[in-house]
């Protein structure tokens, strides 16, 4: 089982787009990727999730992020299900789906709950260095909110690029709105620098350990 901060395991997978090597397939293009598992093809909640992801695909791609699905179904089941979605819902699924029919990758990533034979609704966000940045699990009975995952990706990218943290419900936080949090000072000198920056109007603070600013 892997955890946040670890390198995503190198593995070759069979998908609806052919054999893909992870994480290289995406990282060599300088892209992040979202690997998400679903319990089974031809099930109602999973169908709504794939429809929702496809509808937001361009938003993810504008951020340099590619989705890739996974379940323990065989590839022909994925293909038939994608055809059903296109014929009945009018949406063509453009991203690949992994056919992990032996459950080997799912087991390695901890996607299969104890005592189960199918995957939970797991989400792994992996950056362009192949590092796992976030892991989210939903139970089989509750579908994912792709808008929240999109928010999470945006926040992770901003944090990575600017060395800041993002508050609850960013960019609509009740205390600081769309501003970002400056990491707390860890030395006396840094504390002094925060206080000086506040006095100059460069940042805002509730206290020296809780400072924030508007991104330029």
Curated annotation (Swiss-Prot):
One Gene Ontology molecular-function label: thioredoxin peroxidase activity
Cited PROSITE patterns: THIOREDOXIN_2
Pfam families the record matches: 1-cysPrx_C, AhpC-TSA
Localization per record: Cytoplasm
Keyword Transferase: no
EC category: oxidoreductase
Residues bound to substrate: 121
Biological process, per Gene Ontology: cell redox homeostasis; cellular response to stress; hydrogen peroxide catabolic process; response to oxidative stress
Record EC number: 1.11.1.24
Keyword set includes Oxidoreductase: yes
Disulfide bonds: 205-211
Cellular component, GO, one term: cytosol
Keyword annotations: Antioxidant, Cytoplasm, Disulfide bond, Oxidoreductase, Peroxidase, Redox-active center
UniProt record similarity statement: Belongs to the peroxiredoxin family. Prx6 subfamily.
Role this protein plays: Thiol-specific peroxidase that catalyzes the reduction of hydrogen peroxide and organic hydroperoxides to water and alcohols, respectively. Plays a role in cell protection against oxidative stress by detoxifying peroxides.
Misc remark: The active site is a conserved redox-active cysteine residue, the peroxidatic cysteine (C(P)), which makes the nucleophilic attack on the peroxide substrate. The peroxide oxidizes the C(P)-SH to cysteine sulfenic acid (C(P)-SOH), which then reacts with another cysteine residue, the resolving cysteine (C(R)), to form a disulfide bridge. The disulfide is subsequently reduced by an appropriate electron donor to complete the catalytic cycle.
Protein name: Peroxiredoxin
Organism of this sequence: Pyrococcus abyssi (strain GE5 / Orsay)
Phylogenetic placement of the source organism: Archaea, Methanobacteriati, Methanobacteriota, Thermococci, Thermococcales
């Amino acid at each position: 089982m892997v955890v946040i901060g670890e390198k995503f395991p190198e593995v070759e997978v069979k998908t609806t787009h052919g054999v893909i090597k992870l994480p290289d397939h995406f990282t060599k293009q300088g892209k992040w990727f979202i690997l998400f598992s679903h319990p089974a093809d031809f099930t109602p909640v999973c169908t709504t999730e794939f429809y929702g992801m496809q509808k937001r695909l361009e938003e993810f791609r504008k951020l340099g992020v590619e989705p890739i699905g996974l379940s323990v179904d065989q590839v022909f089941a994925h293909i038939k299900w994608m055809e059903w979605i296109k014929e009945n819902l009018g949406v063509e699924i453009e991203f690949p789906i992994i056919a992990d029919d032996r459950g080997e990758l799912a087991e390695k990533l901890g996607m299969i709950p104890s005592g189960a034979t199918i995957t939970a609704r797991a989400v792994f966000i992996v950056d362009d260095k192949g590092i796992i940045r976030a892991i989210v699990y939903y139970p089989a009975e509750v579908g994912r909110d792709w808008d929240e995952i999109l928010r999470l990706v945006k926040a992770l990218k901003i944090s990575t690029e600017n060395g800041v943290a993002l508050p609850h419900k960013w960019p609509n936080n009740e205390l600081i709105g769309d501003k970002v949090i400056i990491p707390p000072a860890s030395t006396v000198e840094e504390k002094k620098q925060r206080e000086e920056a506040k006095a100059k109007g460069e940042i805002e603070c509730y206290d020296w350990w809780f400072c924030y600013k508007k991104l330029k």
